[in-house]
UniProtKB/Swiss-Prot annotation:
Pfam families: F-box, LRR_At5g56370. Keywords: Leucine-rich repeat, Repeat. This is F-box/LRR-repeat protein At1g48400. CDD domains: F-box_AtFBL13-like. InterPro entries: F-box-like_dom_sf, F-box_AtFBL13-like, F-box_dom, FBD, FBL60-like, LRR_FXL15/At3g58940/PEG3-like. Disulfide bonds: none annotated. The lineage of its organism: Eukaryota, Viridiplantae, Streptophyta, Embryophyta, Tracheophyta. LRR repeats lie at residues 71-97, 125-153, 174-199, 225-251, 327-358, 359-384. Coiled coil: none annotated. Transmembrane segments: none annotated. It comes from the Eukaryota.
Amino acid sequence: MAMMRTSPRDSISNLPDEILGKILSLLPTKVAASTSVLSKRWRNLLGLVDNLCFDESMVVYPNEEEETSGSLRFCDFVDKTFALLSNSHIKKFSLSRVYKYNDDVDGMVRRWIRTVMERGLLEIHLHATPMSFVAIETKLLTSNTLVKLTLSARCFVEVERVFFPALKSLSLFSILGDYTNYIRLIDGCPVLEELYMRDGDYPFLRLTCGTNVESASLKRLVIFTHNPNEMIWHELIYFEAPSLVYLDYSSYVSAKYDVVDFDLLVEARLSLRLWVSTNDYDYSDDDDDDDDDDDDDDDGDYYIVEPKAPIFGDVTELLAAIRNITTLHLSPDSLEVFHFCCKSMPVFNNLLNLSIESNKDKGWQVMPLLLKSCPNLHTLVIKGLVHRVTSRCGDACACIPKKQRKIVQKEEALCCLRTCQVKVLQISEYGGYFQELKQMRHFLGKLECLETVKVGVHAENNNNSEFLRANVLTLPRVSAKCNVHFI
């Protein structure tokens, strides 16, 4: 019997124009425009696109001459696209410039921005690489409809007046502009709810974003600043955001934090870094004598220990301001900052979830005090158990120097883990090394309220997962309710 032949059907072309317009709006505009050559059916659908995304990085030029002429062709394509769209409503406009700055091209960019602003724009995203440049005019910073604005890299902002009455989300990533213009920009967004900032990528410029945040409406704040060469710009950090519920803050530690009203804050993610190494401030003393000097055990020589310079930074007020949170995430550096730069640890009565990340070069000195300051902690999440052994790791850690073991045995009943209310312990990137297994034994043998332990094996040790599992499952558990699961 002859096989029945079926002709392929173009089912997507049978969809209504409105749906095809939505589909094309999800594609890069260059790809969407190329569909016009498919058939007559697709020829006029570009006019239904309400999301324009122009990315010059998608174009690769073989040499500098082609780069110059090619960049102009890219601009010509953008101009023709706007001409085809006529007076169509535009919801979102994204532009990424890559190639060299040119006065004519800069004028075109300003014209494109004005055009989309006049068409009820909801979102605009502008990015310029170090080779290019986008100057933001004052008249471009006024819109009654814009709800989301992103300015990235070499976008230069110099404004006299800003008014975005509907703007809910603002992202500023390493923009060019001084502190005054930054403040004007924030002040011109009366209903702003989300603010994302990155600063410090230009070491020759003063930090503008992230040193001062004042917004009555702000609910979500993400700050990343990185300028390890300019301690002077970290004398004072000021936050006033009474509606804030989420904070993600990454920066070198500052001399002082002035925080006004973080009472509604629920979750904080902190990655604070010290300006100097702490290797000379905390060390392990592994001998069995009663002194704190490792060197004098070898030859009886006498060493004069010079006093250490105080470490720059004070996070006392910052921690006091976030004491009502329920979830806290800490980087390895933050643990050291808490230890060296906090004069008085607040009590986190509402903290239910604590997540920390370990690093073999960073210590756990603050862990005993931190755990004692979280009386109602329910879930403890630790990414990696390997950390730097110091003379002050305390009873939260199994890596106790030999000299202190007798003292620790006498104070066993006072161990911070025995009074800890943690019911869920989650360990990720577990490698099964001797130090890690000791730490697991320490947790399982001291956390009396523990009910669930979740262990995720490091990808490098997947081949030994059964062996690692067996080692952990045989460890003694002080809690009769404790169940161990490998995830």
